[in-house]
Amino acid sequence: MSVTPSIDAVRDLRAASCGPVGAPSVTSDLSENIILTSLDDLHNWARLSSLWPLLYGTACCFIEFAALIGSRFDFDRFGLVPRSSPRQADLLIVAGTVTMKMAPALVRLYEQMPEPKYVIAMGACTITGGMFSADSTTAVRGVDKLIPVDLYLPGCPPRPEAIFDAVIKLRKKVGDESVAERIKIAQTHRYFTVPHHMKRVEPIVTGAYLSADTQKAALKPGAGLPMAAELNTPEIDVSPASQSSSTYES
């Protein structure tokens, strides 16, 4: 004997088994296993956590950067891995004076680095030429005349703590970038290429200013002054005959 279910029983069964379809929600269990992010954030996080610098040290500023490699400062915690090849580096740290003769080599290294790449100008000599540019015709007065610079680190020389501060600021810049907008915000000014022939200028400090009329008038009063007694030392005879006689007397 078969029993036919009532209409109310069928409706109750349908309501219990076939609930309304709603929007999926992220539960607490799912949020502990899945990280929701964007492609830009993931890409920037990977790049700022593994900066591979190419060390280009030409003067005393590089000694301060070499101090970071030791255990006292431990720059490995920032993910910095020094590379000896520009094709494996994404950060160029220029530390020291850049001369006209080394300028083509610096530009060649920059051109061989893959995109995206960054440059830190470390020290006063790198940024403005420093004290060497005052009386030198071969010192480049600012590395930004050769290649684009992302971050300037002044000092003579900068302390290792200042280098860490520069790396942290560069990491913030990398973290705020976007792949789609990088072309729009990229530096568009041209820099010197390798075959560029840099023009040499005549030296400025040649000593010719001493022969000017104003300098002659300023030096004339001191020309006739008597020499101090301490400077009037008797002349010493260094002939072989005098040396042999002094040896015989001793």
Curated annotation (Swiss-Prot):
First-level EC class: translocase
Gene Ontology cellular-component annotations: plasma membrane-derived thylakoid membrane; respiratory chain complex I
Gene Ontology BP terms: aerobic respiration; electron transport coupled proton transport; photosynthesis, light reaction
UniProt binding sites for [4Fe-4S] cluster: C60, C61, C125, C156
Reactions mediated catalytically: a plastoquinone + NADH + (n+1) H(+)(in) = a plastoquinol + NAD(+) + n H(+)(out); a plastoquinone + NADPH + (n+1) H(+)(in) = a plastoquinol + NADP(+) + n H(+)(out)
Predominant cellular place of this UniProt entry's protein: membrane
GO-annotated molecular function: 4 iron, 4 sulfur cluster binding; iron ion binding; NADH dehydrogenase (ubiquinone) activity; quinone binding
Bilayer topology annotation: Peripheral membrane protein
InterPro entries in UniProt: NADH_UbQ_OxRdtase-like_20kDa (IPR006137), NADH_UQ_OxRdtase_20Kd_su (IPR006138)
Region annotated Disordered, chain positions: 230-250
Polar residues: bias regions: 240-250
Keyword Endoplasmic reticulum on entry: no
Stated role: NDH-1 shuttles electrons from an unknown electron donor, via FMN and iron-sulfur (Fe-S) centers, to quinones in the respiratory and/or the photosynthetic chain. The immediate electron acceptor for the enzyme in this species is believed to be plastoquinone. Couples the redox reaction to proton translocation, and thus conserves the redox energy in a proton gradient. Cyanobacterial NDH-1 also plays a role in inorganic carbon-concentration.
Protein name (record): NAD(P)H-quinone oxidoreductase subunit K
Source species: Prochlorococcus marinus (strain MIT 9313)
